[in-house]
Amino acid sequence: MILVAVGANLPGPWGAHPVDTCRRAVDEIARIPGLRIQAVSAWYRSAPVPASDQPDYANGVLLLSGKADPAVLLAQLQDIERKGGRVRGVLNAARTLDLDIIDIDGLVRDGPDPVLPHPRAHQRPFVLLPLRDVAPGWIEPRLGRNVTLLLADLRGGCGEVDAPVDWPVQYR
């Protein structure tokens, strides 16, 4: 099981709305040899973290099957980010596309990049809510806690995350 988080909060070359960019990123990820998309979460709207005057983000998670070398997959995702207009610069800056590897088959890896599982995924409801859509039984490999318990740990202090009716999409 491979989990990849997809997010955006700026228009980019693939669309005027962040969800358009996220959907196109899903199509691009589907073209990675050796991987198959099993599920795509609903698209959730979330406030930027840390809080700022940036536009809200669209966030989702993909469940993939297949085999992936972590460093190779990271390079492939960063290439897709560049195609989607991502320019790396200031930490936590607004972006046209953000793709993060959350987990690859429960692998625990401290480096080189990517660190797995994603070191902050368990602290982010905008990752955990869509992750629960596609992998409700997922257990964070370092903590040994499932996604439902991780979400319960965050209640009441991690910002607003909404799933508006017009944002969800099913992958074709």
Positions of predicted regions on the chain:
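A general structural signal for well-ordered alpha-helical packing
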Residues: 22, 26, 59-61, 74-77
